[in-house]
From Swiss-Prot:
InterPro entries for the chain: Ribosomal_bL12, Ribosomal_bL12_C, Ribosomal_bL12_C/ClpS-like, Ribosomal_bL12_oligo, Ribosomal_bL12_oligo_N_sf
Designated gene of the protein: rplL
GO biological process, one term: translation
Pfam family, one: Ribosomal_L12
Summary of the function given for this chain in its UniProt record: Forms part of the ribosomal stalk which helps the ribosome interact with GTP-bound translation factors. Is thus essential for accurate translation.
SUPFAM superfamilies: ClpS-like (SSF54736), Ribosomal protein L7/12, oligomerisation (N-terminal) domain (SSF48300)
One Gene Ontology cellular component: cytosolic large ribosomal subunit
GO molecular function, one term: structural constituent of ribosome
Domain of life according to the entry: Bacteria
PANTHER family attached to this UniProt entry: 39S RIBOSOMAL PROTEIN L12, LARGE RIBOSOMAL SUBUNIT PROTEIN BL12M
Organism: Azotobacter vinelandii (strain DJ / ATCC BAA-1303)
Protein name, UniProt field: Large ribosomal subunit protein bL12
HAMAP family assigned to the protein according to its UniProt record, in alphabetical order: Ribosomal_bL12
NCBIfam families assigned to the protein according to its UniProt record, in alphabetical order: L12
Self-association and partners: Homodimer. Part of the ribosomal stalk of the 50S ribosomal subunit. Forms a multimeric L10(L12)X complex, where L10 forms an elongated spine to which 2 to 4 L12 dimers bind in a sequential fashion. Binds GTP-bound translation factors.
Length: 122
């Protein structure tokens, strides 16, 4: 009478961990294999889908020729005083706003570019 898969599974489930380890070693020796997990070769994996960025940073790369206009826009966007906004513009490249939504970042970029600045979103 041949053993079924169910008989073998029941026998193994009643074994201790040490007995299972010994069984695996014996099977490796008998069949000349190792119990290392085989890597399945499936169909080519599609490129991983990049998570869409949810928080953006508006970086003033260059103030351009119209610094006064850029300072005004920086003040509107950040709520900074004149002196602080001028320091941001004079210190370009630098962060204007960070941790904001995509829509807010694009609106800030558009406003700064219309004022004459060069802007990057990160």
């Amino acid at each position: 009478m041949a053993l079924t898969n169910e008989d073998i599974i029941n026998a193994v489930s009643e074994m201790s961990v040490m007995q299972i380890v010994e069984l695996i070693k014996a099977m490796e020796e008998k069949f000349g294999v190792t119990a290392a997990a085989a890597v399945a070769a499936g169909p080519a994996a599609a490129a991983p889908v990049a998570e869409e960025q949810t928080e953006f940073t508006v970086v003033l790369a260059e103030a351009g020729d119209k610094k006064v206009n850029v300072i005004k826009v920086v003040r509107e966007l950040t709520g900074l005083g004149l002196k602080e906004a001028k320091a941001v513009v004079d210190g370009a490249p630098g962060v204007v706003k960070e941790g904001i939504s995509k829509d807010e970042a694009e609106a800030a970029k558009k406003a700064l570019e219309e004022a004459g600045a060069k802007v990057e979103l990160k």
